[in-house]
């Protein structure tokens, strides 16, 4: 089956979060299962270089009147060799900063044009006007940055229209822009409506994907239910409830080629799951690297996360004084909201042997955190799927997490029964407040001191298997249900 997978970030070419991990691993798993997959990505300079994309395979023209022609480049995804197409438009993508923000952390003012071009290209490659002969049977778009792709196909109504799948990785990010962009982006005025991509007097890229795609997926069964409610739907709950029959929750997977403690080149000491001595060596090395006291019996809690309220980092700061009184150490790597960054910096300055804060994301340090930590703190207020708990399982680091989204789908709280049956793989709290979070931490610290019981929990963590094979199989089934014996069925125009 021919699948075009469109995303704004793909690991290891460019990464700001979990979307990149999924966009690198899922296409690779689909290709390994025999599917004919192409990845479409913006032509960020580093991504062009890392993919080896030197060959131009066709012109994309200048659809938005930028005065600069866009070109389609062809490269390969390092590691898996999956073909990658990159939208090379220096006027939009060749700049310092990140994929979405400038070096000062401000959204690029032309993000609407940047990601409209990505969406336009995804749809264009599905039509008879494509610069390449290869035509997808399925167009799989991801998050708001590619949400206009199904809308373009709706507007153009090509003779051979592929099936369209739109995956929500985080519904909080919606890509809302001024309505006066609609004609410039090439859409007829009637599509700017409640039954279209209009959202409270703005053009919403996310709503476009939700409204015009044939099927909607999100990254865990629990999150698929949550986003149909006002508490989690971020204003889209009505549309999602209306399309509930077309909405499926499929858990993400973990890339165990990348996250494998036995072959992890980022570690000081490679170790196999269940190797307590190897785990202890990595803990000691991490404590030394971060300037924490060399205390093998102190529970070392790690955080590998964006630092914002939706990740519950304010709860960590509020509970931190009591956590430190328990004799624990806390190590943080991540970036996010300035007040939270400053809060962790201040805590590290006040307690340098118990708290370490590394502001800014480091993939190698994230691996060493997983290897050296005893517990992973994930107090997220909402968590569509979560990937770090999968990595933690493999590295023997026990999650302490809020029961939401994919965390609720993948964690079994530690209690007498679950501990005795070998099912307990974490410490879960139901209510998102400081008291509930702190109680979960206290339970974890209490059992950490009982090594026989802690070993049971670590063993259960190591036994979890969230590789991409199962998830890729579910996506293949979904694609087949949409295409039948070939060719997309497509959603009919209203």
UniProtKB/Swiss-Prot annotation:
Synthesizes alpha-1,4-glucan chains using ADP-glucose. This is Glycogen synthase. GO terms for biological process: glycogen biosynthetic process. Pathway: Glycan biosynthesis; glycogen biosynthesis. InterPro entries: Glyco_trans_1, GS/SS, Starch_synth_cat_dom. Belongs to the glycosyltransferase 1 family. Bacterial/plant glycogen synthase subfamily. PANTHER family: ALPHA AMYLASE DOMAIN-CONTAINING PROTEIN, GRANULE-BOUND STARCH SYNTHASE 1, CHLOROPLASTIC/AMYLOPLASTIC. GO terms for cellular component: cytosol. It holds the Pfam family Glyco_transf_5. The gene is glgA.
């Amino acid at each position: 089956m021919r699948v075009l997978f469109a995303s704004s970030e793909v690991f290891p070419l460019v990464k700001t979060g979990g979307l990149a991990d999924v966009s690198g691993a899922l296409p690779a798993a689909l290709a390994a299962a025999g599917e004919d997959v192409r990845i479409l990505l913006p032509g960020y300079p580093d991504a062009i270089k890392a993919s080896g994309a030197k060959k131009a395979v066709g012109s994309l023209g200048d659809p938005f009147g930028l005065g600069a022609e866009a070109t389609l480049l062809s490269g390969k995804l390092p590691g898996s060799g999956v073909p990658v197409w990159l939208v090379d438009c220096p006027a939009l993508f060749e700049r310092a900063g990140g994929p979405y923000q400038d070096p000062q952390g401000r959204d690029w003012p032309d993000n609407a044009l940047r990601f409209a071009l990505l969406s336009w290209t995804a749809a264009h490659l599905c039509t008879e006007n494509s610069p390449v002969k290869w035509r997808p049977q399925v167009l799989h778009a991801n998050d708001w940055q590619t949400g206009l792709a199904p809308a373009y196909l709706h507007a153009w109504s090509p003779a051979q229209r592929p099936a369209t799948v739109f995956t929500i990785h985080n519904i909080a990010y919606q890509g809302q822009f001024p309505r006066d962009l609609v004609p410039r982006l090439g859409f007829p005025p009637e599509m700017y409506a409640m039954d279209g991509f209009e959202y409270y007097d703005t053009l919403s890229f996310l709503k476009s994907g939700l409204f015009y795609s044939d099927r909607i997926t999100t990254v865990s069964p629990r999150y698929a239910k949550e986003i149909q409610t006002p508490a989690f739907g971020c204003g889209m709950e009505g549309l999602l409830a209306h399309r509930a029959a077309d909405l499926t929750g499929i858990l993400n997977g973990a890339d165990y080629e990348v996250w494998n403690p036995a072959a992890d080149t980022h570690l000081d000491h490679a170790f196999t799951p269940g190797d307590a001595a190897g785990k202890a060596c990595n803990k000691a090395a991490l404590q030394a690297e971060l300037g924490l006291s060399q205390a093998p019996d102190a529970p070392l809690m790690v955080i590998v996360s964006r630092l914002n309220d939706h990740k519950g980092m304010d709860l960590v700061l509020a509970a931190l004084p009591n956590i430190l009184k328990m004799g624990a150490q806390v190590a943080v790597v991540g970036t996010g909201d300035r007040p939270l960054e400053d809060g962790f910096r201040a805590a590290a300055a006040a307690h340098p042997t118990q708290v370490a804060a590394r502001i800014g994301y480091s993939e190698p340090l994230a691996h060493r955190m997983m290897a050296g930590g005893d517990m992973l703190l994930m107090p997220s207020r909402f968590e569509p799927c979560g990937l770090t708990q999968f990595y933690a399982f493999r590295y023997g680091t026990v999650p302490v997490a809020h029961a939401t989204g994919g965390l609720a789908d993948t964690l079994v709280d530690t209690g007498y029964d679950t501990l005795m049956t070998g099912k307990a793989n974490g410490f879960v709290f139901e209510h998102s407040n400081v008291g509930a979070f702190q109680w979960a931490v206290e339970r974890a610290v209490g059992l950490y001191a009982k090594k026989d019981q802690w070993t049971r929990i670590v063993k259960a963590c190591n036994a979890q298997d969230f590789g991409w094979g199962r998830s890729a199989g579910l996506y293949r089934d979904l694609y087949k249900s949409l295409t039948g014996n070939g060719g997309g069925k497509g959603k009919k125009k209203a």
